[in-house]
From Swiss-Prot:
One annotated Gene Ontology cellular component of this protein: SKA complex
Subunit structure: Component of the SKA1 complex, composed of SKA1, SKA2 and SKA3. Forms a heterodimer with SKA1; the heterodimer interacting with SKA3. The core SKA1 complex is composed of 2 SKA1-SKA2 heterodimers, each heterodimer interacting with a molecule of the SKA3 homodimer. The core SKA1 complex associates with microtubules and forms oligomeric assemblies. Interacts directly with SKA1. Binds directly to microtubules; but with a much lower affinity than SKA1. May interact with NR3C1; the relevance of such interaction remains unclear in vivo.
Localization: Cytoplasm, Cytoskeleton, Spindle; Chromosome, Centromere, Kinetochore
Keyword Transmembrane: no
Protein name, UniProt field: Spindle and kinetochore-associated protein 2
Major localisation: cytoplasm
Keyword annotations from UniProtKB, A to Z: Cell cycle, Cell division, Centromere, Chromosome, Cytoplasm, Cytoskeleton, Kinetochore, Microtubule, Mitosis, Phosphoprotein
Keyword Coiled coil: no
Any Gene Ontology biological process: chromosome segregation
Function noted in UniProt: Component of the SKA1 complex, a microtubule-binding subcomplex of the outer kinetochore that is essential for proper chromosome segregation. Required for timely anaphase onset during mitosis, when chromosomes undergo bipolar attachment on spindle microtubules leading to silencing of the spindle checkpoint. The SKA1 complex is a direct component of the kinetochore-microtubule interface and directly associates with microtubules as oligomeric assemblies. The complex facilitates the processive movement of microspheres along a microtubule in a depolymerization-coupled manner.
Source organism (scientific name): Homo sapiens (Human)
Amino acid sequence: MEAEVDKLELMFQKAESDLDYIQYRLEYEIKTNHPDSASEKNPVTLLKELSVIKSRYQTLYARFKPVAVEQKESKSRICATVKKTMNMIQKLQKQTDLELSPLTKEEKTAAEQFKFHMPDL
């Protein structure tokens, strides 16, 4: 029984040695065939880091999803309020026969920016 254990132990040592040699050869070939990428990280390490980054992203997404929903609802409420205000102003203008002076350059720019950010209007 002890001889079989020793034999298995030697097999594992040889396998470990073979893996070390394969790793050494791969690193050597990468360095010689692609010297400019020799400073790059090991792909396995990059995958582990990617996994950590993905986990962080999911955490951030979970934290900020309610904020995004609330922001969207706020934007909708603001748009509704602006629409009501614009309608009231138009009604008042019609009732009083009041004409507005043309918009200044700054006012036109502000109106364009507002329409860009609030396309629902």
